[in-house]
Every structure is written in C-alpha cells, then in structure tokens.
C-alpha cells in the first residue's frame, strides 16, 4: 500500500488522505449520509469512511466484466476500509487535482472535497442519451464531477436530500459561470454524465438542522463550497478558467467548430493561427460573438422570433465588424 498523504482535517476529527489512486475520508464522528454511489447508495447510517477513486483505463477494462458495485467493494479492500460502512465515487480525474473548500458561520462548518473533469463527458440535462441500460448492461463514460460534502451538524434524511438538490444546483452554477459547453449538444453543460455526490452529517451533534435549501445558511455554505471547489478543481484538472474562456474560439467550441477549417486554404498557417488567436482574445470580439450566440440560444429555446434575432445579429455585425469586411 502507498504511503498516506494527509490533505484535509476538520473540527470533527475527519481526515482525508490520498493513497492508492484515491482520496479516503476517515470520519472522526459517527456519520449518517446520502450518496449517489452504487455502494451503499441512498440514505444510510453509521458511515465510517468515504472515498473518491481514480479509474484508470486498466480498471475501466475490468468493469467490462464486473459491476461497479463489485469494483467498489474490491477497491474498499485495497484501501483497507469496510465495504459495509463506506461509500465510493469513481472518476477519471486525478486525485492530485482535487480541491478542498471549507466555509464557516458561527458554529456551523461545511467542507467540500471535489474532483472535476469536463473535457470529454460534460453534458446538459436533456441531451440525447449515450446508452440504454438493460439487465445491468451499460456503457461507462469517463469524465465526472465528484463532490464529498461534510457538515459538523446533524441532518435528518430529508435535509440531506434537500442538500443534495442544493449541491446539484450549485454544480450547475459553477459550470455556467465558466460557460462549459456540453459535448453532446449546442447547449451549456449542467454536469457530466457520471457525476457523483455524497453528503454526510454529524449524528452525534445535538442540534438537528431541518433545512439545507437556498434560503438557509447551511444551504448557502454548501453551495459556496461546491461552486468554489468545482471551479478550482476544473482549473487544476483541465486548465479551464474564466480567463481561458474569454475567447471567441472558446465560446464557439459548443458548436463543434474545427480550427483547421479556418485555415485549410491558407498558405502561411502559422501566421494565420497567431493572428486568429490574438483576434479571438480581444474583449470586443468576445462580446460581439457572445451577443450573437445568446440570440441563437433565445431562438432555439423559442423565446425570440428567428427573424428578429437574425436582423439584430446582422445589425451587430454591420455596426461592429466593418474593419473585417
């Protein structure tokens, strides 16, 4: 077994370590929780640990002949945790790129431990499906945003489920802020096809909180932890930031435009690419492109008449792009 490296500890005695291609959280108190995992998924009591595991190509091949639950039980043994009292999430993101964010207010503390990969598997709720599951047979895609949330207070099952909704909405906010494109449609991603969330509360705490929605301070802290940790984890894993997204080419990526199409008939391709990238970074060009793309979105969502949007887009180009005509 690899040497454990401590990356996080909190006021309740929880400790998170990186080892064996995983982040393992060892709980310092008795915890109940809710998880999307196939190992002890749903609501459970008496969790002792939780883990997030990097799924290598070799292990993806292993899954072709085994269930995800069987794999997680096998991995529990490798990590030295009891499969009866743990839950595990899978991802293709590197554990070294994880981000931990903690927020506090008075006696309330919330932490999120997050990994995020969005290059391959980012998708929008309602996109065409990638597979149809029957009798447990389906395809496993790589990508994945996984979040483990820890609170120092006690939450009942309904409150944990409420927190799951808040955390999911916060994930969508993080992706929206970065304008992450879906890989399966022209829309913006709301997550990936294989995201996982696990939320744990302190069963030993006397004060039981009843709400984790957006109006509650608990919900606010959960959401802020999720938004910040996902944003930073994406930066570490795939180098997507607000700065990198401030580009015409980045904004057009959701339309599957191939940069090679821009210069296939150009003789001096190197110079053309240099000029194209410089032009793509200009704030004015990003603003023009974004304005027109927003009009397209309005039309596709039946919120704006196509002819009106077309005329306005044409006017934007005519009034702002005369230097290029």
Q: At which residue positions do the language-model features occur?
A:
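Alpha/propeptide regions of enzymes that mature by internal proteolysis
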Residues: 1-325
